Amino acid sequence: MTAHEVNFDGLVGLTHHYAGLSFGNEASTRHRFQVSNPRLAVKQGLLKMKALADAGFPQAVIPPHERPFIPALRQLGFTGSDEQILDKVARQAPRWLSSVSSASPMWVANAATVCPSADALDGKVHLTVANLNNKFHRALEAPVTEALLRAIFRDESQFSVHSALPQVALLGDEGAANHNRLGGEYGSAGVQLFVYGREEENEIRPARYPARQSREASEAVARLNQVNPQQVIFAQQNPEVIDQGVFHNDVIAVSNRQVLFCHEAAFARQKVLINQLRTRVDGFMAIEVPAGEVSVSDAVATYLFNSQLLSRDDGSMLLVLPRECQDHAGVWRYLNKLVAEDNPISAMQVFDLRESMANGGGPACLRLRVVLTEEERRAVNPAVMMNDALFTALNAWADRYYRDRLTAADLADPLLLREGREALDVLTRLLDLGSVYPFQQTGAADG
């Protein structure tokens, strides 16, 4: 059956700021306390979406979350009206305010893990929400992510959206950022590669930075998504690269159809994995980048592998890259050599995503890949599909509501909270989502 990959990109939230919340993500740590520009950030993302949609790659949007997230502060014992809570936490525990104001839901590669209908035992598209257990600010995301996905993939005859795994470290799950699918045509059965950083009975794990994904979680997600057991491979990421800042597999590898583009040090027992894939995937091609050409540290600094690898109509592939790759002489030299060689990657497109990149999120972080047949695509909420009208509407919406300068101190401004809620109210109507946010369901609580 004919199917296409649709990229659902996350809209950057109104509270996008640099707080250094993500230990193990070196860009996040390095840019802590810098001044951010939320309006520029959301527009950089929109420009990428529109450019790819115009080039014939189906695009859709996933909205941001409600931030600052007052219900989480109430859970932490802060009381009073919303405004009083903001004031208290800003004075008493500003780090909590930063955490509940994080715009991290924009990195929708961590929203869920997707199984296309061609791989599922019941013939439906499955999406399992990620619990993002390793970081407090990300563990807040799962309930609203689930509500958003249910509002987008609302036809239960075509889609199954599963709640996140229990919030325990043993089942730490980071979503599609640790998942690849390889195969031929999108509509044919593929091989799903689940990548983990640790497992309970295995002493091999990173020493410096946390391994966020457990094998136990990956196995549970594969079961929930009803992936045919004959079409699954579980592989461990190299713990040494996790300790060099590769906090998700999509910082060191990207796949599309029959191609796996990765660093030579990406996986533990990499030769064994490559041989497995060669046996299981017709026409499989591994493009392994040697450390002598691009070091792991340069790959992390430029997000070479946090790129999008997209299939064009002629069978060739386009590599979508952040501008940092072009700015790095060695990486850019390697890339120009790559596209000149005999392999499916024949073209590159560079985007300026500096606002997201400074928090450790490149092109691949910003998108959730969903393979859909034509019938399934028609069943998706049509209001989220990117086109000229939506691009114009979202730019106008951003101009109206987004600030062009934000610091950690601004997060305590009650106006920011009100602006955000008004903006999301408007957005849910624009995207026909219904009442997906807690403030819409309970009213803006006064205490």
UniProtKB/Swiss-Prot annotation:
SUPFAM superfamilies: Pentein. Its EC number is 3.5.3.23. Pathway: Amino-acid degradation; L-arginine degradation via AST pathway; L-glutamate and succinate from L-arginine: step 2/5. The keyword Hydrolase applies. Substrate binds at residues 19-28, 110, 137-138, 212, 250, 359. The keyword Hydrolase applies. Signal peptide: none annotated. InterPro entries: AstB_sf, SuccinylArg_d-Hdrlase_AstB. It catalyses: N(2)-succinyl-L-arginine + 2 H2O + 2 H(+) = N(2)-succinyl-L-ornithine + 2 NH4(+) + CO2. Belongs to the succinylarginine dihydrolase family. PANTHER family: N-SUCCINYLARGININE DIHYDROLASE. This is N-succinylarginine dihydrolase. The gene is astB.
